[in-house]
Structure formats: structure tokens, C-alpha cells
A protein has these predicted regions:
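Conserved S/T- and glycine-rich ATP-binding loop of Class I adenylate-forming
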Residues: 19, 56, 124
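Metallo-beta-lactamase
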Residues: 89-97, 118-202
Length: 203
């Protein structure tokens, strides 16, 4: 059985997620935006064994804990290849007055596979060029980062953003998922695909 733990981190209250197997205690980490010590404590409290870090995108509020966290856990880090330009650039500092994250760890080019964690990668550019979502059919769960929120969608006024591309990504990818799918967004509360179809003014 897979379980989700939500951790609110950093000044932007980014949602960092731990998706973990209750039998093996293996875990995936999504978007560790800040507070590596806090994330580590949550991992240790549950005796989890991290297997990989997966990014929905590479803005600073989603990657801030990476340097310290990957020293603690030398595991693969992956993001969509189209997001490398954001990760490798000072433009990952959002808003612009924030400093870029120093000493970012290297990423792997091949999407990690972890037994017991079967998911579909959904490329959803628009908020950033390589934004993506991770859909876990067996748990009816999708991690959307800053592509889709409860009652809102991601901003597109930052470098690499494009409103029409974002809306197309949401409609062509996310809105085709089952309505009962739980949406775990990059900020704010969880929602469902069905609820967003009915109530989100941007869809």
C-alpha cells in the first residue's frame, strides 16, 4: 500500500511529498523545496528508505533542500529533460530577488524505476518548459507541482512560461484522468480531478 505524507516547507509553503510503501518503507521524494532537516526528520520518524527524488519543475521553491538532502541520501534526482535549462540557470530563482540555490547536485538522465511504484509520466509544460506530473494509477493519485492547484492553475508570467501551453497541458493530460484521482499540488490543499472539472474557473 502506498501512502502520501505532505510536508509544508519554506516561505512559500511548498508542498514536499513523501510517497511511501507501508510494507517495504521505500519512499519517493517530490519537490524538496526547503528545510532539509525537517524533511529528514519526517523520513526518520517513519523509518523510510528514500529511493529517488522526482521534481515536477525546477523553480527555487521546489529545489531548495536538494544540496543538503542529497548529501544525506545519495539517491537519483530526476526531472524532465526540458527542465534542465531551468535547473542549470540562475533563472530558477523565483521571484528574481531570491538567490539561486548554490551547489545543486547532479541529476540523472534516465527516469528511475522503483519496484512497487508504478507511475505514468505526464509532460505538462506551460508553467515551465519541462514541467511534468506523476500519475500513480493504483493509488488514483497525481502529483501536479505548479501546473494545477485547487481552484487555480500555475502562473505563466515567469521565464519559460506560456498560458496557452499550460491550459493545453491541463486539458489534454490531467483532465483525461479519472475524476476520482486525487490531485496533490505544489501549494495549497489536495483536490480531485472531478472537483477541478466542475469548479476551477480556469478550466
Amino acid at each position: 500500500m502506498l501512502k502520501v505524507t505532505t510536508l509544508h516547507v519554506g516561505p512559500f509553503e511548498t508542498n514536499c511529498y513523501l510517497l511511501w510503501d507501508t510494507e517495504t518503507l521505500h519512499a519517493l521524494i517530490f519537490d524538496p523545496g526547503a528545510e532539509a532537516d525537517f524533511i529528514q526528520n519526517a523520513i526518520q520518524k517513519r523509518s523510510l528508505v528514500p529511493q529517488a527524488v522526482l521534481l515536477t519543475h525546477a523553480h527555487v521553491d521546489h529545489i531548495g533542500a536538494l544540496p543538503e538532502l542529497l548529501k544525506l541520501y545519495p539517491i537519483p534526482l530526476w526531472m524532465h529533460p526540458a527542465e534542465h535549462v531551468v535547473y542549470d540557470s540562475p533563472d530558477n530563482a523565483v521571484p528574481p530577488w531570491l538567490p539561486a540555490v548554490p551547489d545543486l547536485p547532479p541529476y540523472v538522465n534516465e527516469l528511475p524505476t522503483v519496484p512497487g511504484f508504478d507511475f505514468q509520466l505526464l509532460p505538462t509544460p506551460g508553467h515551465t518548459p519541462g514541467g511534468c506530473c506523476y500519475y500513480f494509477p493504483q493509488r488514483q493519485t497525481v502529483f501536479t507541482g505548479d501546473t494545477l492547484f485547487a481552484g487555480n492553475v500555475g502562473r505563466t508570467d515567469l521565464p519559460g512560461g506560456d498560458e496557452q501551453t499550460l491550459l493545453k497541458s491541463i486539458n489534454d493530460r490531467l483532465m483525461l484522468l479519472p475524476e476520482e484521482t486525487i490531485v496533490y499540488a505544489g501549494h495549497g490543499p489536495a483536490t480531485t480531478i472531478g472537483r477541478e472539472k466542475r469548479t476551477n474557473p480556469y478550466i
